[in-house]
Amino acid sequence: MARQVALDRVRNIGIMAHIDAGKTTTTERILYYTGRLHKMGEVHEGGATMDWMEQEKERGITITSAATTCFWTPKYGNYAGLNHRINIIDTPGHVDFTVEVERSLRVLDGAVALFCAVGGVEPQSETVWRQANKYGVPRIAYVNKMDRVGANFFETVKAIRERLGANPVPIQIPIGQGEVFAGFVDLIRMKGIIYDKEDGSTYTEVEIPHDLENEARTWRINMLEAVSELDETLLEKYLNGEDITEEEIRTVLRQATLGVTIVPVLCGSSFKNKGVQFMLDAVIDYLASPVDDGEVEGHDPKTEEPIVRQPKDEEPFAALAFKIATDPFVGKLTFFRVYSGVLNAGSYVLNSTTGKKERVGRVLQMHSNKREERDAVYAGDIAAAVGLKDVRTGDTLCDESKPIVLEKMVFPEPVIEIAVEPKTKADNDKLGMSLAKLAEEDPTFRVKTDEETGQTLIAGMGELHLEILVDRLKREFKVEANVGQPQVAYRETIRGTVEYEGKFVRQSGGKGQFGLVVLRVEPLEEGKGYEFVDEIKGGVIPKEYIPAVNAGIQEAMKDGVVAGFPMQDIKVTLIDGKYHEVDSSEMAFKIAGSIGFKGAAKKANPVLLEPIMKVEVITPEEYLGDVMGDLSGRRGHIEGMGQRAGAQFVSAKVPLSQMFGYSTDLRSMTQGRANYSMEFESYREVPRNIAEALQEKRVGKDSE
């Protein structure tokens, strides 16, 4: 099957937003207008197509980034009349599902940032915006819910500029706001669009209403000045008062959007069917195709030499697996983005991350959770493969004769853990396998066994994250489990630098054991994890024993010296040592490495760390004092406060250990009128009195 659409007419986009900005409804409307849906599903009725997990339908929030494909032919603009393929990744807006947003942004060429015209820029919008900045994703902004009481387009534009540090340039302004929202002025064509009151999908083009002429002129000048600054020819025309064509404006707007220097802003009400078609035109006009994104960089798995691949079908096949999902009908699905080349169904691919070769059984293009078989997928496509057993999120799939490893995805470490116990013997048998499947899908979800108690512990990014995973155990895998109290994932590190000798000797006749290492341990900056450096000179320790020393150190780091928590952000340098020709072995050096590290860590001013969360609360003014007092009482540090959409907001940094059950407390404190968001910020040293209490607790547990 040949390529259906030329590569420069493909758009891989994400829709990113805060919860309740209307993301799922907007996606539904896109699918409806592009002919993919015959009936629209409303989130508040629990019928939306993109939200295909049971809990998503129940909770009205999107958890997994479902991928779907559709076609659109713009009516206006530089690409009018040309058919385009749009692949949409629907991303969740809840902060516990950061990993879903992160991995979708990695494979996108552009995004539609959705804002609620009433709420403006919410805390989660900032988080997602920062993630998009990290990956340099071009964006257009769509101010949704213009029909709601209290909607304010211009305040939202101002908030995008002030709170997100972006450069928003409206290319539309609304005709009426709130209940009187009737349409918009197109500032490029200088025409009014009035929607049919009964059916928002039909509209009439009109002259700009008299009372809006001045405002429209002002905002058009604002737009022209913004684009003229980026193009000398346009600037000259503008300064000389010459006419600038629609095509010229769109061309420079596109360049500026792709360069992430401008964010074109549109408005609408997806629920009322107003604005979605024009937003789709803007996706085609201003967001990148895989061709604009250009080459992708990677390296040779053997030589580490840099390799570059062009987004062309003729290039060798290279793709990134960005999501693993379990489908009730076909089993394990691997979602992947093709960066170069062609993949035929039934062919073999090399997983260059692991070095394993696997056969792709079938290739599916997903429409939400419905499937469409494809014989082949091409550069720029997003699809799902059936039959890949050992692929994990972030792995590279490629042509085995031309191997390449693409840049890996980096995921945050979990900050909260709970114990799970199966309710029955039958549940016990299925628990391990079910948890392993969930961990395959989600890299921020970890499963481990507590060696002291034998309990199974699951770790994740927040209470809601773990709650939903336990819920999935029950629904998808039919495993009933009792859940313990949430526990904080404390960590340990060191503050000083120490050199220490680790020695393991057993020599009492016959074959003995001998390993001696000298280690230097020192702190690394936060988030760097662990670094091992081999500085052995003159073969005082043979090369084959050095990996064993490293393994011994890493094993010792799992069980810290302050209170037995894992250690992090430490650099260890192996500077000297001794070996015995007969008695030395890998095991002896592994134990010596472990002894040396433990001894050094005890002397290097070890400290206990706790996860600190960034908390934002939006509350009516009358509860502000109570909310702030409560946060301070939780060892919180108030960072800032201000007004937001008729309410007050407070931002604070609070230890995670103090935030369990906060949603219930906040609800009762404010009669359910406040809401909050919380995300992991960093690890910070635990105050001495709390560290001592934790140590006693651990020691007490050990002596039981």
From Swiss-Prot:
Cysteines joined through disulfide linkages: none
Keyword match Cytoplasm: yes
GO terms of biological process kind: ribosome disassembly
Protein name: Elongation factor G
Record-linked PANTHER family: RIBOSOME-RELEASING FACTOR 2, MITOCHONDRIAL, TRANSLATION ELONGATION FACTOR G-RELATED
Domain tr-type G: residue ranges: 8-291
Main localisation: cytoplasm
Gene Ontology annotations for the cellular component aspect, listed alphabetically: cytoplasm
Binding site for GTP: 17-24, 90-94, 144-147
Lineage of the organism: Bacteria, Pseudomonadati, Chlorobiota, Chlorobiia, Chlorobiales
Keywords: Cytoplasm, Elongation factor, GTP-binding, Nucleotide-binding, Protein biosynthesis
Gene name per UniProt: fusA-1
Family: Belongs to the TRAFAC class translation factor GTPase superfamily. Classic translation factor GTPase family. EF-G/EF-2 subfamily.
Record-linked Pfam families: EFG_C, EFG_III, EFG_IV, GTP_EFTU, GTP_EFTU_D2
Main function: Catalyzes the GTP-dependent ribosomal translocation step during translation elongation. During this step, the ribosome changes from the pre-translocational (PRE) to the post-translocational (POST) state as the newly formed A-site-bound peptidyl-tRNA and P-site-bound deacylated tRNA move to the P and E sites, respectively. Catalyzes the coordinated movement of the two tRNA molecules, the mRNA and conformational changes in the ribosome.
GO molecular function terms attached to this record: GTP binding; GTPase activity; translation elongation factor activity
Cell compartments where the protein resides: Cytoplasm
PROSITE patterns, A to Z: G_TR_1, G_TR_2
Signal peptide bounds: none
InterPro entries in the record: EFG_II, EFG_III, EFG_III/V, EFG_IV, EFG_V, EFG_V-like, EFTu-like_2, G_TR_CS
SUPFAM superfamilies the record matches: EF-G C-terminal domain-like (SSF54980), P-loop containing nucleoside triphosphate hydrolases (SSF52540), Ribosomal protein S5 domain 2-like (SSF54211), Translation proteins (SSF50447)
